[in-house]
């Protein structure tokens, strides 16, 4: 290995971006196969390869940061910029869904009956499960902040407790969302209302699952004493992501569930 005279981490060649891209291709193709041909084989293969990629990529990053000390303050600064840019790209991603929703709802076409919700659609009551889900995510935002403050103060017990509560609330949100989908009186194929509703809330639900997984990894790392008050970017990134998921849900609730109903 050549002598390094800078603070940057020169990453070794890794197969995980390639396997991650392959798993994304398998999952999206598998989702199409499931929708149109009721076959979950390709989707299951995609989920399996995605899970393996996540495990091995996280393992490598934990090794590089915690055990090899490659994540210097300069590297962490770069990672912070990367996470900020990623969240900005996610904001633009959801902007597209809100644009589609408002484009359809503010000037409904004659095919929709000239009204919103379209003729024949019975929207969900925003004061039932959606309101409960809103309170759950707001509570999880409080608990993740509690976890962050506990970590900064070196309070290991409260950090683990708060992080566990956040993950439990995330799982509870996902279960409630799944039950809401199961009982919804309309489907994804019920015109523009069904498609915008399920795609927007479905992608948000996917982000909650990803965020819960991210936080679960952070909990395991905290149990193994990986985080300190000045070296915990993995948790910080997960907390930023979780707050982003919270804010997106508030916009979804106000726009699609409350105003859109």
Swiss-Prot record:
Superkingdom per UniProt: Eukaryota
Reaction(s) catalysed (UniProt annotation): 4 Fe(II)-[cytochrome c] + O2 + 8 H(+)(in) = 4 Fe(III)-[cytochrome c] + 2 H2O + 4 H(+)(out)
GO biological processes: mitochondrial electron transport, cytochrome c to oxygen; respiratory chain complex IV assembly
UniProt cross-references to PROSITE patterns, sorted A to Z: COX3 (PS50253)
Major localization class: mitochondrion
Record's keyword terms, sorted: Membrane, Mitochondrion, Mitochondrion inner membrane, Translocase, Transmembrane, Transmembrane helix
Topological domains, Mitochondrial matrix: 1-15, 67-72, 153-155, 224-232
Membrane topology: Multi-pass membrane protein
Subcellular location: Mitochondrion inner membrane
Residues passing through the membrane, by range: 16-34, 41-66, 73-105, 129-152, 156-183, 191-223, 233-256
GO MF terms held by the record: cytochrome-c oxidase activity
Alphabetical list of InterPro entries matching this protein: Cyt_c/ubiquinol_Oxase_su3, Cyt_c_oxase_su3_dom, Cyt_c_oxidase-like_su3, Cyt_c_oxidase_su3-like_sf, Cyt_c_oxidase_su3_a-hlx
Entries under CDD domains matching the protein: Cyt_c_Oxidase_III
Keyword ATP-binding: no
Pfam family, one: COX3
GO cellular component terms, semicolon-separated: mitochondrial inner membrane; mitochondrion; respiratory chain complex IV
Entry EC number(s): 7.1.1.9
Mitochondrial intermembrane side: 35-40, 106-128, 184-190, 257-261
Purpose of the protein: Component of the cytochrome c oxidase, the last enzyme in the mitochondrial electron transport chain which drives oxidative phosphorylation. The respiratory chain contains 3 multisubunit complexes succinate dehydrogenase (complex II, CII), ubiquinol-cytochrome c oxidoreductase (cytochrome b-c1 complex, complex III, CIII) and cytochrome c oxidase (complex IV, CIV), that cooperate to transfer electrons derived from NADH and succinate to molecular oxygen, creating an electrochemical gradient over the inner membrane that drives transmembrane transport and the ATP synthase.
Subunit structure: Component of the cytochrome c oxidase (complex IV, CIV), a multisubunit enzyme composed of 14 subunits. The complex is composed of a catalytic core of 3 subunits MT-CO1, MT-CO2 and MT-CO3, encoded in the mitochondrial DNA, and 11 supernumerary subunits COX4I, COX5A, COX5B, COX6A, COX6B, COX6C, COX7A, COX7B, COX7C, COX8 and NDUFA4, which are encoded in the nuclear genome.
Family from the record: Belongs to the cytochrome c oxidase subunit 3 family.
Listed name of the protein: Cytochrome c oxidase subunit 3
Organism whose genome encodes this protein: Sus scrofa
Name of the gene encoding the protein in the UniProt record: MT-CO3
């Amino acid at each position: 290995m050549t002598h390094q005279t800078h603070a940057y981490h020169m990453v070794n060649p890794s197969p995980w971006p390639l396997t991650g891209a392959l798993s994304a291709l398998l999952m999206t193709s598998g989702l199409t196969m499931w929708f149109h041909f009721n076959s979950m084989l390709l989707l299951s293969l995609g989920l399996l390869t995605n899970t393996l990629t996540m495990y091995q990529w996280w393992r490598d990053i934990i090794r590089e940061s915690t055990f090899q000390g490659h994540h210097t303050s300069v590297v962490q600064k770069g990672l912070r910029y990367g996470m900020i840019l990623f969240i900005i790209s996610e904001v633009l991603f959801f902007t597209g869904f809100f644009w589609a929703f408002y484009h359809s709802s503010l000037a409904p076409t004659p095919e929709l009956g000239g009204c919103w919700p379209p003729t024949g659609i019975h929207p969900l009551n925003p004061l039932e499960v959606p309101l409960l889900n809103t309170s759950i995510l707001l509570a999880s935002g409080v608990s993740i902040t509690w976890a962050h403050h506990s970590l900064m103060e070196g309070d290991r017990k409260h950090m683990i407790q708060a992080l566990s509560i956040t993950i439990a609330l995330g799982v509870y949100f996902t279960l409630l969302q799944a039950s809401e989908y199961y009982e919804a009186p309309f489907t994804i194929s019920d015109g523009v209302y069904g498609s915008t509703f399920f795609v927007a809330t479905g992608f948000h639900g996917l982000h909650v699952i990803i965020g819960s997984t991210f936080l679960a990894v952070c909990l395991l790392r905290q149990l193994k004493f990986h985080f300190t008050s000045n070296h915990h970017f993995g948790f910080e990134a997960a907390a930023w992501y979780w707050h982003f998921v919270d804010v997106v849900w508030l916009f979804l609730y106000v726009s699609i569930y409350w105003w859109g109903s």
